A protein has these predicted regions:
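Histidine/acidic-residue-rich, glycine-tolerant segments that coordinate divalent metal ions
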Residues: 9, 20-30, 36-37, 53-173, ...
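Soluble non-cytosolic domains of exported or imported proteins
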Residues: 36, 40, 129-132, 224-227, ...
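Glycine/charged-rich beta-loop-alpha catalytic/anionic-binding loops adjacent to active sites
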Residues: 16-32, 118-122, 271-274, 312-321
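N-terminal beta-rich core of secreted/periplasmic extracellular enzymes
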Residues: 1-20
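Non-cysteine beta-strand/loop elements that form the S-adenosyl-L-methionine
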Residues: 3, 118, 299-302
């Protein structure tokens, strides 16, 4: 199987100009994580693999999985929970990046929730004693969570944004909402931390005499590496090599590079294949859940100017011109070539499944971090 994504990010519209320039679209969204390339490149690879299977009369099956709402919606988790990936032996994925690599990577698990406080509105000056501020509930919760940071595992990450806080200073707000993310490499720690965040919310509601409700929005497992498949991808990526810019692309890249804040890579790194190593990313992805069920491996290709951060206007810009397309084409070629090796050497599947079984342990039973809730089709609406 090959995973594809296609969702954009709100507030990051951008033309393909090397200078910050908002695109005129209806919702202000932009492909700052390159999922337009991800989805198209994966579909392209699936078509090429199918063609190869037919032409060579090789027995096998290829499935392209279009997966929605990776950016906070955990689309793959619902698919995994409902058995959409059953009968798949190996799963490939890839992701746009500013470098070319096929590392054996882990990630943070995460879980999110929206916490809503309801109070009593009143005139903030003439009758404040008659009101109960929902915003006070949010702020009290945030204060307790911020104090909690001293007493959580070092690798944890907790972020929040206040999505509703009232409309006028002279009105005691009767509705307020805060949106929380909790992350850690261990999904069980994430589960525990989220429960502590809920307790902080409950305490805040009690202390401010407001009413609390909350909704789990999403939850992802950490990435489970599989060296058996990952090393195959690395060998194929190394065989194809990196990205070569034309003179026009080089000039464009130089202009983009000048706008980057403390870039970690240099111009020219797009030509390189990064050495194979174990790595950890502190972000999260719903590919994680898939990787605990099926041997899963992926690559990153330089669809952006070296040093570009994901979720930036620079990523949107490069992803909308030939640099992005070159990275996408490289990914499609690598996935296709790697798949043919597996069809020709089915013992890879046996080894990959044995590795996965040893990593997850014999007692592992999959339970989605987001529970049994239905997909939040409006999760971007605040």
């Amino acid at each position: 199987g090959i995973l594809g994504e296609f969702d954009a990010l709100p507030g990051l519209s951008q033309t393909n100009s090397p200078f910050q320039e908002k695109a005129l679209n209806s919702n202000g969204a932009g492909h700052a994580c390159g999922h337009h390339l991800f989805g198209a490149g994966s579909a392209w690879a699936a078509v090429m693999i199918k063609q190869w299977l037919i032409e060579t009369k090789t027995p096998g099956r290829i499935i392209f999985f279009g997966t929605p709402a990776e950016e906070g919606g955990s689309g793959k988790v619902y698919m995994a929970r409902e058995g959409a990936f059953e009968n798949v032996d190996i799963m490939f994925h890839w992701h746009p990046s500013s470098s070319n690599q096929a590392n054996s990577s882990t990630s943070n698990a995460n879980k999110s929730g929206k916490f809503t406080f309801k109070g009593i509105s009143a005139h903030a000056a003439s009758a404040p004693d008659k009101g109960r501020s929902a915003l006070d509930g949010v702020e009290a919760m945030n204060m307790m969570v911020n104090m909690m940071r001293e007493h959580i595992p070092q690798e944890s990450r907790i972020h929040y944004v206040i999505t509703k806080g009232g409309l006028a200073p002279n009105v005691v707000p009767d509705l307020a909402e805060v949106y929380y993310y909790v992350r850690h490499p261990d999904r069980l720690v994430v589960k525990q931390l989220f429960e502590r965040v809920v307790k902080a919310a409950e305490g805040a509601a009690m202390g401010t005499e407001t009413k609390l409700s909350y909704e789990v929005m999403h939850g992802n497992y950490s990435l489970m590496p599989n060296d058996t498949v990952q090393k195959l991808l690395h060998s194929q990526l190394s065989a194809f090599g990196g990205i070569e810019y034309t003179a026009a692309e080089q000039k464009y890249a130089e202009q983009i590079y000048e706008t980057l804040f403390e870039p970690s890579l240099k111009l020219g790194d797009e030509k390189k294949i990064m050495p194979y190593k174990q790595s950890h990313t502190y972000g999260s992805t719903d590919v994680g859940d898939v990787s605990w069920l099926i041997p899963t491996a992926g690559i990153r290709t330089a669809t952006w100017v070296p040093g570009t951060s994901a979720h930036s206007w620079q990523a949107v810009a490069a992803g909308g011109m030939s640099i992005g397309l070159k990275g996408m084409k490289l990914a499609a070629k690598v996935l296709t070539a790697s798949a043919t090796k597996i069809y020709e050497n089915p013992e890879i599947i046996v080894d990959a499944k044995q590795e996965l079984a040893s990593r997850v342990g014999e007692d592992f039973k999959y339970e989605a971090l987001l529970g049994d809730r239905d997909p939040p089709l409006d999760y971007r609406v605040n």
